[in-house]
Amino acid sequence: MSKILKSVTLGDVKNGGIFRALGKEFVKLDADEHGCLVLAKEIWTRMPFREGDDPECPNDLRRSEIMPYLGNCLAEFTKNGTPLSTFIPLRIDLQDTTGQNEYGIFEVRIGLLTLRGYGKYWRLIPKVDAPWWLATPYGTPNCSPRTDNDYYVWSVNTD
């Protein structure tokens, strides 16, 4: 899960460096004048994208069960004394794998990497022993990408 944290102390951490904050370990992916893009070093939980079906918007991250979970993480961090301003807004472009923009852009303080973000930072991302979600929706309900076993990077099957 990706997060943006605003902190002057992260200026000393190089991109790809691991640091501890909020009781968890993170990897610094990038920084600019607004703050740092960081990724949790470990998977925090395993969960489905959605319980049940959503025929209207099957790929919409905003309607997934992941976003309430991430919102609860943010609430827990702030309840434990971390100022909300520590988490600067992250704009997630939900352009799908075919370039369609039907889901638009939305802003969160804790979110997921997109497929493009993964492509940009993959060398810095620690290896984990389980699959994890990206924010990018697949382009059509008639073709569903998946990764499987240890020999697929991306498999697209048609109906």
State the predicted function of each range.
Residues 2-159:
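Collagenous Gly-X-Y triple-helix signature in extracellular proteins
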